Amino acid sequence: MVSVNDLKTGLTIKTSDGMIWQVLEFQHVKPGKGAAFVRTKMRNIRNGNIQEMTFRGGERVERAHIERNKMQYLYPMGETYVFMDTESYEQLELTTAQVEAALPFLLENMEVQIAIYNGEVLGIELPNTIVMTIVEAEPGVKGDTASNVKKNATVETGHIIHVPLFIEAGEKVTVDTRTGDFTGRYNG
């Protein structure tokens, strides 16, 4: 058990209803009248929903110890996706529902972290930035540079991202997997 006064960003807790949450933001509030409390913004680990929660000062919550295993994505197999533990070489099959949030950025042979709680796979954590190849890009209109104009481009997974006008098909770019935003050209 951990006091809500000791909550930190990134900490995972288990609430009384059995749900597992990760702390995204927290704020200790001490009003002029009444008792102090902690206002938090939390992300549900199982479904990704974000919710604000308020706890009374001094309240205790159960800490959820989440195991993170380094695995390599191998290939899709029907309705499942096959991953391999990089240390033991054991293979693990995950369903589409378990990897759905990561699918737009999941590339074969990519190393990912698999989050596991009490033997239950909670989801996949991708690297923060990855290198992807643009397979199709809308043509940029010359002279249309009055502001920070972007165009649609399709990456190798079929996902569409917004890129600057100068990016063409065949180029490698870096993408932030948390937001899906273009972060720059890849110079590797």
UniProtKB/Swiss-Prot annotation:
Pathway: Protein biosynthesis; polypeptide chain elongation. It comes from the Bacteria. Keywords: Cytoplasm, Elongation factor, Protein biosynthesis. GO terms for biological process: peptide biosynthetic process. It is found in: Cytoplasm. GO terms for cellular component: cytoplasm. Coiled coil: none annotated. GO terms for molecular function: translation elongation factor activity. Disulfide bonds: none annotated. Pfam families: EFP, EFP_N, Elong-fact-P_C. Belongs to the elongation factor P family. NCBIfam families: efp, PRK00529.1. Involved in peptide bond synthesis. Stimulates efficient translation and peptide-bond synthesis on native or reconstituted 70S ribosomes in vitro. Probably functions indirectly by altering the affinity of the ribosome for aminoacyl-tRNA, thus increasing their reactivity as acceptors for peptidyl transferase. This is Elongation factor P. It comes from Exiguobacterium sibiricum (strain DSM 17290 / CCUG 55495 / CIP 109462 / JCM 13490 / 255-15). The lineage of its organism: Bacteria, Bacillati, Bacillota, Bacilli, Bacillales.
